[in-house]
């Protein structure tokens, strides 16, 4: 369901309300075509002047009533006053006493003498008029009064155009005005017109003197600018020097990479030497080292014969229960060590002589020593000499 009221429905509601108000306000004169002395309420006849039948004003139907109102009949409903009451002249009041709107949009105006105060039953009619005006003003917009508009022209208005003003014509009735068309006061589209300024009055001209000389502080500003320029050039020189060191930094990086590569090569060679010669730095045989690690001190506590402990023998014997005894145990028979095969070591030393010794004379001397070597110690001596000559 549409919650908004259309303009046609609004016009119908206003018209229905006006008809109801007119019905109750015009009850004393209902059913007559003209106003006569018999139908006019006492106290109202002296007030009504003029002949309203001759001053009926027909207005166009209001645009807000919609197409539905335009389609109705154009009948005229007027209020007529007898000619005897029309002889007295009067002035038109700003708002009519009351009006009956018909189906065709015809509005009849009733005039009132402003010098006569409402008395009797006319007072109730006046109150009804006020209520009706409030109802009309609630739904109908009052016509706007136009203000004098001065047409703006470049160079100022002419003498004849200064006295001309555009004024909207008024309407003789209480119906809604459809408005009137007038020329826009502005020649620049939607921009509002601007009031012309009055001609300037004569004034005393200003004294014009010689322009002042340059300020003293200008020299100081120039000195500051020169100093800033010098500092900027100095900074540029320093930046150029820093950029020139970039190539040297790159060269240092390359040298560091070379040093790291050389160090890695030396470490690899040292690891190879350690693998090829896993000897002891002290020159002590492994059996002696094991024997020194197995020696320990035995402490005897409690009663017993300790005479054997004072002997000069460095060996201490124990029985099955780990008690020191003077009787020595039978010595264990040592197994003879098998003779090591030196052929493999000789092949390795021959390969070392070929790869590590570049001098032909030294190479020939190492080969002769290798041929005469028959023990492991001799072979180890030859390996040490080959490594020293290579370094």
From Swiss-Prot:
Essential cofactor of the RNA polymerase L that plays a central role in the transcription and replication by forming the polymerase complex with RNA polymerase L and recruiting L to the genomic N-RNA template for RNA synthesis. Also plays a central role in the encapsidation of nascent RNA chains by forming the encapsidation complex with the nucleocapsid protein N (N-P complex). Acts as a chaperone for newly synthesized free N protein, so-called N0, allowing encapsidation of nascent RNA chains during replication. Its main location: virion. Keywords: Coiled coil, Phosphoprotein, Viral RNA replication, Virion. Residues 343-391 are annotated as: Interaction with the nucleoprotein. InterPro entries: P/V_Pprotein_paramyxoviral. The modification Phosphoserine is found at residues 188, 257, 292, 294, 301, 374. This is Phosphoprotein. Pfam families: Paramyx_P_V_C. Residues 216-279 are annotated as: Multimerization. It comes from Mumps virus genotype A (strain Jeryl-Lynn) (MuV). Residues 1-194 are annotated as: N-terminus domain. It is found in: Virion. Belongs to the rubulavirus/avulavirus P protein family. The gene is P/V/I. The keyword Coiled coil applies. The modification Phosphothreonine is found at residues 10, 16, 91, 150, 165, 250, 258, 282, 298, 375. Homotetramer. Interacts (via multimerization domain) with polymerase L; this interaction forms the polymerase L-P complex. Interacts (via N-terminus) with N0 (via Ncore); this interaction allows P to chaperon N0 to avoid N polymerization before encapsidation. Interacts (via C-terminus) with N-RNA template; this interaction positions the polymerase on the template for both transcription and replication. Interacts with host RPS6KB1 kinase; this interaction may play a role in the viral replication and transcription. Residues 218-245 form a coiled coil. The N-terminus consists of a long intrinsically disordered tail. The central part contains the coiled-coil multimerization domain (MD or OD). Forms a four-stranded coiled coil structure. The C-terminus constitutes the alpha-helical X domain (XD) that binds to the nucleocapsid (N-RNA complex) and the L polymerase.
